[in-house]
Amino acid sequence: MRNDAIKWFVCVVFSGVLLVACGGTKLTTTQVDDARREKPVSDILVIAITYEKELRHSFEDKFVEQLKTAGIEAVSSADVIPISEKQQLEKDAILKAVNEFENDAVIITHMVGVEEKEIITRAPSRGYYGHYLWAYGNTHEPGYSSTRITVRLATNLYDVKTEKLIWSGKSETLRPDSINQIIDDVIKAVIKDLQKNKLLPPK
């Protein structure tokens, strides 16, 4: 898939090919610092790594909203550290922001990769003319092939003072049908696991 088609997540249009329905999001791996388990953070700076300015805002704003709903203070880096597209955040700018807003943790999300796999429906064994009829029908109707898209993201939570990793997780979204679905599902999965490990304060 071309880079301009992927951007941060994935935007795919298939002509005459069935895109399989949404498959949902799950955390495939997680890691927690045992010393920090059940020691919740209180205020998070949210950073999404992407060249696309609108996607950065969208992801971070949704993450901040969900964290606040979960009972924790949070701020979007896009709101407090504005940068141009394709420009990286400088460490000094991040430190200035966490000091100004008194964040005790930083959470960073980036894309690991996008996998696209075409699934071909195999012809049943019906003899040569049965095969012809089956193939003819599927050639003239959608559904002969399908494309499975898998989007993988990684999210890390760091302690501001020590800069040590508190929690990390890798997510996998199978057959996403929109960018918003990926964003919403990943955020929900991450927050749920942080709550399970009592890294977020009780509401």
Task: Pin down the residues of each PLM region.
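Alpha-helix termination/capping residues and helix-transition junctions
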Residues: 16, 38, 100-103
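Secondary-structure transition/capping residues
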Residues: 16, 74, 201-202
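N-terminal segment of the mature soluble domain
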Residues: 43, 47-116
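Surface-exposed short loop/turn segments
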Residues: 88-157, 161
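Sec-dependent bacterial lipoprotein signal peptides
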Residues: 1-22
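Charged, low-complexity, helix/coiled-coil-prone segments
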Residues: 31-46, 124-137
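Conserved protein kinase catalytic domain
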Residues: 64, 124-125, 191
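C-terminal/domain-edge helix-coil "capping" segments
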Residues: 22-42, 51, 140-203
